[in-house]
Regions:
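Short loop/turn motifs at secondary-structure junctions and domain boundaries
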Residues: 37, 99-105
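Short hydrophobic beta-strand segments that form the core of ligand-binding sensory/regulatory domains
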Residues: 108-112, 129-136, 142
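Short coil/turn motifs at secondary-structure junctions
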Residues: 50, 116, 138-140
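A short, aliphatic-rich beta-strand micro-motif
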Residues: 107-124
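Juxtadomain coupling helices with adjacent low-complexity linkers
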Residues: 2, 13, 137-163
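Intrinsically disordered, low-complexity terminal regulatory regions
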Residues: 1-66
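Regulatory sensory and allosteric helical modules in signal-transduction proteins
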Residues: 47-51, 59-101
């Protein structure tokens, strides 16, 4: 991570310690990432819902275009990240048929969020994706390894406050 990313992560961690809800943490992350990292054109969260937790529903977001409101788990990059439990990075979305969004977007990263409260074991947490952090950019090759690590740290921060 860059020094600027480390500082931003510290700021988010400080806010999260006193935030009233996980949703407030998500709102702050979306707002600050969108404001401070100008290559991020859309920053938002999708939450697992449905009777079998089989659909992702739009949560807090900040961005320049209308997002998809509901995503079944068998569709798109968000569905792929939710079902695999792994971060999905695509730095050329035009070459990936799973991408569902705007033609203006060139890069996309989706990071699954797991409950990481102390009473949940690591094996239980890994099985239970509860949300996702999704970031889109109008620039190709936005998400390198350092960027991915930073975004995964932001997502993990949310997981500490999810039920």
């Amino acid at each position: 991570m860059t020094p600027a990313q480390n500082e931003l992560l510290k700021e988010l961690e400080s806010f999260a310690r006193t935030a009233p809800t996980a949703e407030a943490v998500m709102e702050r992350i979306a707002k600050l990432l969108h404001e401070k990292l100008t290559r991020y054109n859309w920053v938002g969260f999708y939450l697992m819902e449905g009777p079998a937790f089989d659909v992702l529903v739009l949560g807090p977001y900040v961005g320049s275009f209308s997002p998809t409101l509901r995503i079944p788990l068998d569709r798109g990059l968000c569905g792929a990240a939710a079902t695999s439990g792994e971060t999905v990075v695509v730095n050329n979305v035009g070459a990936d048929p799973r991408y569902l969004g705007s033609d203006l977007v060139k890069s996309n990263i989706v990071v699954p969020i797991f409950v990481t409260k102390s009473e949940v074991t690591k094996s239980e947490a890994k099985k239970r994706v509860v949300a996702e952090l999704c970031i889109e950019s109008y620039f190709a090759d936005t998400f390198d390894t350092a960027e991915q690590k930073f975004i995964e740290s932001c997502a993990a921060l949310v997981g500490r406050y999810m039920e």
